[in-house]
């Protein structure tokens, strides 16, 4: 099978929350720079996800990562695309692969039975900034 674009990259699930400036200031106190990407421990990220869910509900979810974003965009513009990546056999890994397929991107990925989870990226969006507190072990 011939593809227009093949990518190799990290399989990330973006969890996007809308936030206000008050939460942005609280993030800065935690050492999370506004408008940047910050690696954080899994427990800290889970605590923030729980806090944001309590404040505003469930996040929007999408497969993500730099290569994934590129291959999905190309697919949505009509290119025949393929993504090569690694995911764990967990909810995020399954969601990632389903979302790739839903966006017309081929893959041959089989989820690994791993102690390391598929990585989520917490995307916080305010009216002025996009901030990425992330953790991606697989």
Per-range role (PLM):
Residues 12, 88, 137:
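Short, glycine/serine-rich, charged loops/turns that create anion-binding
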Residues 17-20, 96, 123:
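Short acidic, glycine/serine/threonine-rich loops at helix termini
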Residues 1-84:
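Glycine-rich phosphate/adenosyl-contacting loop at the front of the ribokinase-like
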Residues 24-25, 100-102, 126-127:
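Short, hinge-like loop/turn segments at secondary-structure boundaries
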Residues 129-138:
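Single conserved hydrophobic/aromatic residue that forms the stacking wall/gate
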Residues 50-56, 81-107:
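A glycine-rich beta-to-alpha transition motif near the start of alpha/beta enzyme domains, typified by
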């Amino acid at each position: 099978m011939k593809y227009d674009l093949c990518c190799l990259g990290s399989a990330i699930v973006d969890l996007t929350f809308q936030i206000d400036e008050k939460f942005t200031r609280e993030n800065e106190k935690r050492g999370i720079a506004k408008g940047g990407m910050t690696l954080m421990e899994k427990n800290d990220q889970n605590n923030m996800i729980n806090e944001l869910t309590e404040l505003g509900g469930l996040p929007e979810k999408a497969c993500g990562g730099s290569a994934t974003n590129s291959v999905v965009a190309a697919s949505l513009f009509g290119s025949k695309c393929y993504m090569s990546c690694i995911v764990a056999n967990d909810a995020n890994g399954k969601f990632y692969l389903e979302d790739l397929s839903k966006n017309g991107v081929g893959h041959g990925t089989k989820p690994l039975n791993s102690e390391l989870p598929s990585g989520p990226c917490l995307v916080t969006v305010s009216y002025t900034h996009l901030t990425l507190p992330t953790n991606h072990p697989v």
